[in-house]
Every structure is written in structure tokens, then in C-alpha cells.
Swiss-Prot record:
<protein>
    <recommendedName>
        <fullName>LysM and putative peptidoglycan-binding domain-containing protein 3</fullName>
    </recommendedName>
</protein>
<dbReference type="InterPro" id="IPR045030">
    <property type="entry name" value="LYSM1-4"/>
</dbReference>
<dbReference type="InterPro" id="IPR036779">
    <property type="entry name" value="LysM_dom_sf"/>
</dbReference>
<keyword id="KW-0472">Membrane</keyword>
<dbReference type="GO" id="GO:0007030">
    <property type="term" value="P:Golgi organization"/>
</dbReference>
<keyword id="KW-1003">Cell membrane</keyword>
<dbReference type="InterPro" id="IPR018392">
    <property type="entry name" value="LysM_dom"/>
</dbReference>
<keyword id="KW-0333">Golgi apparatus</keyword>
<feature type="transmembrane region" description="Helical">
    <location>
        <begin position="219"/>
        <end position="239"/>
    </location>
</feature>
<feature type="topological domain" description="Extracellular">
    <location>
        <begin position="1"/>
        <end position="218"/>
    </location>
</feature>
<keyword id="KW-0812">Transmembrane</keyword>
<feature type="domain" description="LysM">
    <location>
        <begin position="70"/>
        <end position="114"/>
    </location>
</feature>
<feature type="topological domain" description="Cytoplasmic">
    <location>
        <begin position="240"/>
        <end position="262"/>
    </location>
</feature>
<dbReference type="GO" id="GO:0005886">
    <property type="term" value="C:plasma membrane"/>
</dbReference>
<keyword id="KW-1133">Transmembrane helix</keyword>
<dbReference type="Pfam" id="PF01476">
    <property type="entry name" value="LysM"/>
</dbReference>
<dbReference type="GO" id="GO:0005794">
    <property type="term" value="C:Golgi apparatus"/>
</dbReference>
Length: 262
């Protein structure tokens, strides 16, 4: 493993010889020990992701599995940005799918691979009227998807047609086996015209809306009383007071005039 420091233990000398300068110690060769260390260093251990890193890797793997590539013919006026906006992907995804080093490599191709989700609307073959008129089949699925469509399409149509034919035969059998005589029709009419038993409806006594502190008076009665007390009574009192005062004043003036000096 990288970054590992070799650990050498104490090794005894193989031979000791005396020299003029001192003692000469000879040790055995370290070739075997170095090869052992290299073998130990060559061992690799698999590190398993845990926690958020594990979920991140699993989600990224699922995303890669869900992506399929469709091929599209490049028309005049197409750019990487327009295709990315049209198919809801990024320019980086288009560059990665087509191995573009820069955006100028796009103009050297006639077809482009577009990454889309496996079960999306974009994987269905649909063409615009303009594209049909200029270049039919501008949007194509991969050969594997085309073969699967060819294998599944006609068989599904045949099964649907056979199912409808069986339904028609069952309807014809039911119509033929049904008795359309007058007697059976009369029985049906009599059965429908019979009086069915209806459960007796329980009458719930209605609550008196005028029961309470209003002396069982309706709102219109209360309004009439308020109008009479608040408007009509003061009006009669005012008119009576004015007429009475005028009569008293005229009577006083007449008496003064009669009793005055002659």
C-alpha cells in the first residue's frame, strides 16, 4: 500500500572480522525481505462506502442506468444550446455523450447522441411537420429499442383485435339466448310497475323559531313596534302639542283684546 513505511527488525551480523580500523560486520542480503515487503505493499483492500457516500453512489448508479441515448440528425441552425433546451438536458451532458472537446466539434457531425431518461416522453418517436418535410426520421431510437417496438407492436394489435372479436361473439350469444316473447316482456313491465314497500318516514318536530326571550314575536312585529314607538308616537305628540299651543295663544289674544280699554 502507498505511504507504508517498511519496518525492519534487528538483524544479527552473519560474520565479524577484525580490521586495522576496528571490526567489520557482514549482514545477510535483504533481497528476500524487500520482495516480501513489495508483496505486502501489492496487497489491495476494498473500501466500502458508508452513510451518505453510499447513498450518493447508489443514486448516481441508478441515474446512469436510467439514461438512454437517442440519435438525432443535425439540421441547419441547430446548436448545442438549442438542442439542450429542446430535450431538457445540459450542454455538458451532450459533450460527454458525444466526446466533444469543445463546442466546435458539434459542427463536424451529422448526427448527435442525446441522453434522455428511459421512460420519458422524449424516448417516444415523434416528429414535427417541418422536420418531416425536410428530413423524415430526424429523431430515431437506438436499434435495440426499434427491434423491441417491432416485436411488441403487431402482437399487441393482434391480441386487441382477437379480444374485441370474442366480445362481439359473446354479445351475439346473449342476444340469441334472450327470450323476446310478449309474455316475458309483460312480466318485466309488471315487475317494474309493482309498488315497492317504502319505509315510513319519521317526522322530526321542528323547533319553534320564535320561542325564547322575544315573547314569540316575529321580526316584522318587532320592527313595527319600534317604528310605532320611535316615530309615530313622537310625531302625534308633537302635532298635538303644536295645535294645543296655537289654540291657547289665540284664545289668550282674543281675551286681551276684549278686555282692553274701550
Amino acid at each position: 500500500m502507498s505511504g507504508r513505511i517498511p519496518n525492519h527488525g534487528y538483524m544479527q551480523p552473519a560474520s565479524i572480522s577484525a580490521t586495522s580500523c576496528g571490526h567489520d560486520y557482514q549482514f545477510p542480503t535483504l533481497a528476500n525481505s524487500e520482495s516480501d515487503l513489495l508483496e505486502e505493499d501489492a496487497e489491495e483492500f476494498e473500501l466500502r462506502p458508508r452513510g451518505k457516500e453510499k447513498t450518493r453512489r447508489s443514486t448516481s448508479k441508478e441515474r446512469i442506468d436510467d439514461i438512454v441515448y437517442i440519435s438525432r440528425d443535425i439540421c441547419e441552425g441547430d446548436t448545442l444550446n438549442s438542442i439542450a433546451l429542446q430535450y431538457c438536458c445540459t450542454v455538458a451532458d451532450l459533450k460527454r455523450a458525444n466526446n466533444f472537446l469543445n463546442e466546435q466539434d458539434f459542427f463536424a457531425l451529422r448526427t448527435i447522441k442525446i441522453p434522455v431518461k428511459r421512460f420519458s416522453v422524449l424516448t417516444q418517436p415523434h416528429f414535427s411537420p417541418k422536420a418531416k418535410a425536410t428530413r423524415p426520421g430526424t429523431l430515431q431510437l437506438s436499434p435495440e429499442h426499434q427491434e423491441s417496438d417491432l416485436l411488441i407492436g403487431p402482437s399487441s394489435y393482434e391480441t386487441a383485435g382477437s379480444f374485441l372479436q370474442e366480445v362481439d361473439r359473446d354479445i351475439e350469444k346473449i342476444v340469441k339466448s334472450t327470450d323476446t316473447k310478449k309474455e316475458s316482456l309483460n312480466e318485466v313491465v309488471s315487475a317494474l310497475s309493482q309498488e315497492h314497500f317504502e319505509p315510513e318516514q319519521i317526522l322530526v318536530p321542528q323547533r319553534d323559531p320564535y320561542h325564547g326571550a322575544d315573547w314569540s314575536l316575529g321580526w316584522w312585529t318587532a320592527v313595527a313596534i319600534m317604528v310605532f314607538v320611535g316615530i309615530i308616537t313622537p310625531l302625534f305628540y308633537f302635532l298635538y302639542y303644536e295645535v294645543l299651543m296655537k289654540v291657547n295663544t289665540s284664545h289668550t289674544l282674543n281675551s286681551i283684546e276684549k278686555s282692553g280699554p274701550s
